[in-house]
Amino acid sequence: SIDKINELKYTTSMANCRGCTNNCRLTINKFSGGRQYVSGNRCERGIGKEKNKDHIPNLYEYKYKRIFSYTPLTADKASRGKVGIPRVLNMFENYPFWYTFFTELKYEVVLSPTSTRKIYELGIESIPSESECYPAKLAHGHVTWLIRNGVKFIFYPCIPYERNEFPDAVNHYNCPIVTSYAENIKNNVDELNDPSITFRNPFLAFTSEEILANRLVEDCLLYTSPSPRDRSVS
């Protein structure tokens, strides 16, 4: 009624929402009778309808585990022995392929551990330049870790081109560091000069399965028969 409208009283105050880092400036109108109206908010958190959720999935963690959580063959099933793969650079996208490839060829895939300061310090003496990015510097430690853990065959390919995931993409070329950093490793990690250690870093591209398969045989797997090689690539 008109009387109730005339009797309506309200107070206005200002506050900052703490629901997220936006810190929205809120205008809070409190009316007689206990009701209130909030404006200035950009989402429901500012008016108390939605609370911060503590069960939102960590997609970075999910991707990391999804890419690297493969179980290698046991020694009795790995008839070709071990192959070491450093957990660096392009392996954060391509490891599932290489794991499957070498597992099909009956290798036990040995993956270097998660990057830590200790891993970094393992390879610090072989880093040739301070201007390299930190992920590239870590590669020295990962390769050194594989060597010091007795892995005699290390595979770290140079990948100029990735698989084209979008038909209308202008290009799918890796940065120069990812493209050729294994060459840097080969020429600066002195322990790779040990004749008992085989370090393979062929230049490969994911643009053609047929060319990729042929290059793998030509560059680093000459002793494998074509049939298991073709199957592992496909």
Residue ranges and their predicted role:
Residues 1-30, 138-149, 153-167, 186-187:
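Phosphate/diphosphate-binding loops
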Residues 1-80, 229:
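Flexible inter-domain linker/hinge segments
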Residues 223-230:
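Conserved small/polar residues in nucleotide/adenosyl-binding loops
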Residues 164-219:
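Glycine-rich, acidic loop regions that bind phosphate or pyrophosphate groups
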Residues 28-31, 39-40, 95-97, 121-125, ...:
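Short acidic, glycine/serine/threonine-rich loops at helix termini
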Residues 87-90, 120-174, 178:
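Cofactor-cradling patches in redox/metallo enzymes
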Residues 107-131, 202-207:
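Short connector loops at secondary-structure junctions
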